[in-house]
Design a protein with these regions (language model features):
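A detector of tandem-repeat and repeat-rich interaction/domain scaffolds
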Residues: 147-193
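The feature represents the membrane-entry module of six-transmembrane cation channels
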Residues: 1-165
């Protein structure tokens, strides 16, 4: 489902984008962000995508991050074996460097961001949303590892750091689908959970 024909958006005033567009996203109650390629996510360089993430947050809608099937296996491997590459892939988000095909669209989006939340707030919001998704994906991946691999996986420590930074220590103490062979996430600077 689409809410706006972006090719005719220049006919709408900036105030519309700050109100009606956000209300449309809120009415739908859900935005799906297709993060591809995950190592250098194109949506993080596109002004429209970042604007939609802001509107999603401000309207109280749910954001779901999806990877294409062709990216999923590589992302899962990185969760377990190269967690830092995932952190690096999202750390470079900067709304000020985002682009749009139409200069008028870019000007409109920048104007709305400047008049509203501001660049720093939007950058922080996007990073928080992506880090939440990374943590959720990591918890799911940890639960799927077999017991012997799980107990030795660097993912335990990586998730501990990430969950601690997000204030989600309760989730570190109670991993999903806990069973007799599921190990709690380790949080550096504290006892093993």
């Amino acid at each position: 489902m689409l809410t706006v024909n972006q090719h005719s958006g220049e006919a709408l005033p900036q105030a519309w984008w700050a109100t009606a567009f956000k209300q449309g996203i809120g009415a739908i109650e859900h935005t799906c962000l297709v993060l591809a390629p995950w190592r250098a996510p194109v949506p993080m360089t596109r002004a429209w995508c970042l604007w939609e993430m802001l509107c999603t947050e401000e309207s109280g809608a749910q954001l779901t991050v999806q990877l294409p099937a062709t990216e999923t296996a590589d992302f899962r491997r990185a969760l377990v074996h190269d967690f830092d590459s995932i952190q690096r892939s999202v750390a470079a988000v900067d709304v000020r460097r985002a682009e749009a095909f139409e200069p008028a669209d870019l000007e409109m989006i920048r104007g709305a961001v400047e008049a509203g939340a501001g660049y720093s707030v939007l950058n922080a919001l996007v990073l928080r949303q992506l880090r939440t998704w990374i943590a959720d994906s990591g918890l799911a991946a940890l639960a799927e590892l077999d017991a012997s691999e799980r107990s030795k996986s660097a993912l335990i420590n990586n998730l501990g750091v990430l969950l601690k930074a997000q204030g989600r220590l309760d989730e570190a103490r109670s991993p999903p689908r806990a069973g007799p062979h599921v190990h709690a996430v380790r949080v550096p600077g504290s006892d093993v959970l």
